[in-house]
Amino acid sequence: MRPSGRQPQEMRTVSFEPGVAKHAEGSCLVRFGDTHVLCTASLEERVPPFLKGGGQGWVTAEYGMLPRSTHERMRREAAQGKQSGRTQEIQRLVGRSLRSVVDLKALGERQISVDCDVLQADGGTRTASITGAWVALHQCIEWMRARSMISAPVLKDHVAAISCGIYQGVPVVDLDYAEDSTADTDANFVITGKGGICEIQGTAEGEPFSDEEFLSLLALAKTSIADLVRRQKEAVSA
């Protein structure tokens, strides 16, 4: 039995609240149960130096956790003078995931910076960040389209992410902190609306997991991400 009482294939309650930030071109407050992440997308009329004059844009991401997003207060990374390896890994993952579904040529020589700030953490912050960031990015691109800044389609597809794991010998989806901290296997899947796999991160905490177990996790992830994509569509069309 899962601590939350959910079935193995049951995600937490998921919601998207677009347009929550007054100043950002795109924004979304995404909730996966008690994990809440504020995602904002900001348009900048510049590109990184390595892209100057190349006629294409860029999408990048930053990730951070508020000091009291966790059970005990954690120091701000700015106060420590450097980002942790975990923070750098997650923000690169978010950026890669978003770029996988963006036509950078259609964006022109502009950069969209997506900030994912964890307000409250209860497991799955990186997967929630990716899923909410797509909604914020979509809103930013529509902001540009409404001002005739772009004409060709920029977004090629949806992208969403979900965690899966082996908990007490059972494959489960969307692990909360209680499950994630004691799971036998923990994996994150990033998948597009068409079912293409962008990234898989998987770790056996104890015994190695089998091909059969991996395929069961992949099946759970694909079903759940199809549901998340449906919810994204509802959020951006509301």
From Swiss-Prot:
It holds the Pfam family RNase_PH. Transmembrane segments: none annotated. It is an enzyme of class 2 (transferase). It catalyses: tRNA(n+1) + phosphate = tRNA(n) + a ribonucleoside 5'-diphosphate. GO terms for biological process: rRNA catabolic process; rRNA processing; tRNA processing. GO terms for molecular function: 3'-5'-RNA exonuclease activity; tRNA binding; tRNA nucleotidyltransferase activity. Its EC number is 2.7.7.56. Keywords: Nucleotidyltransferase, RNA-binding, rRNA processing, Transferase, tRNA processing, tRNA-binding. The keyword Ribosomal protein does not apply. It comes from the Bacteria. Phosphate binds at residues 86, 124-126. Belongs to the RNase PH family. Homohexameric ring arranged as a trimer of dimers. Phosphorolytic 3'-5' exoribonuclease that plays an important role in tRNA 3'-end maturation. Removes nucleotide residues following the 3'-CCA terminus of tRNAs; can also add nucleotides to the ends of RNA molecules by using nucleoside diphosphates as substrates, but this may not be physiologically important. Probably plays a role in initiation of 16S rRNA degradation (leading to ribosome degradation) during starvation. This is Ribonuclease PH.
